[in-house]
Amino acid sequence: MTIIPSFHHFIYVFLFVMPIVFNGPVSDAAPPSVTVTEILQRTFKRVPGDKSGDAAIYPDQRHLWCNHSVGTPTVDFDGKTWRMWFVGMSMTDNPEIPYGFAARLGLATSNDGIHWNIANEGQPILDFGSPGKFDDVGLSHPFVLRVDDHYMMWYGGIDGRTGKDVGVGPAHVRVEQIGLAISRDGVTWHRENNGNPVLSIGPQDSIDAVQVTGCHVIRKDNRFVMWYGAYNGTHTIGLATSSDGVHWHKENEGRSLRGLMGGKQLGPSVYFDGNQYLMFYNTTRPTPNGGSQWTLYSATSSDGIKWQPANHNKPLLDEAPEGNFGSADGQTGNNHAVHPTKMIFIEDAIRMGYGAEENKPSKGRRYPAGAIGLMELRIGR
């Protein structure tokens, strides 16, 4: 099968005998008592941003490190300031960097969660790791959790190896492993675990022989639970647990989650209301032109392992309106809506960020540009 290059390929989550039981995240501001059932009774709508194509963040030539594409956002709101960490990409001729795109992590801030500006004087907040480290040629897929007085960021590290080097999957697909960095202000970060991965790829017969990346983490009773993207030639979602966020154990006997739609899944975002889990995730769907799109679907679970498709098996978002940055048609652009952030609860609404891409390359670009958008659901309680 021919794999069509897309923004997803460039930037693309515990089990003991008892089921997982949480009372909800205790990191970040605790969400209001909103049930999964209430959320599923309502519909997410796009929130127009103030950048090109109604994006919230769009690649900008003023910031050379992210002038081709931005994506895989992760958002935090402390009641005053919105912060969004994201992947920024620029083209490179360095043969050691897979796909020809250099990927770094940046930060944008906002007062209202709609109008965003790149922070840190327009520079990345986390750049390539030291030579020989697991992230020495790129970074991807950040997920940030506010814990007490600091931020914890798990992210994908790229060391230049591909499927060819590990003997699994398509030869060109890059290896990714998860690292951890800590920050007090969200700008200055310190790599933990001596700059080594905290969750590594598995053996050749595992679900994550090529990639462990693109995660969502919940903290409860001094335990972290991670749903993460696993890849061994097929994208699936796995689980891991940790007492400190550094030392992780892959759960469910290293197997993928069950019951999700499609033959491949990635990009999990998980919410727990005290009784039921809700996951937003990506799988592919065919398009009328014979291509395929990665788009957002939802599922529910009573234990976080076995899932049932929700929303009548329909995507979360309708087709993008004309002129919208998320106009990928399944051929020249594959990402309709991908890698959703966690849900942010604001008054009578829930807001999320997501990535998408255009349906054709714009001037000076080899591939369609990826950008970040917003969607919102009105609770109306």
What feature does the model see in each segment?
Residues 11-21:
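Bacterial N-terminal signal peptides
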Residues 30-381:
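Carbohydrate-active catalytic/glycan-binding domains of CAZyme proteins
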Residues 21-30:
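Signal peptide processing junction and immediate N-terminal pro/mature segment
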Residues 13, 25-26, 104:
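Generic signature of intrinsically disordered, low-complexity, basic-rich segments
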Residues 2-12:
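Bacterial N-terminal signal peptides that target proteins for export
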Residues 6, 21-22, 353:
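Short intrinsically disordered, low-complexity segments
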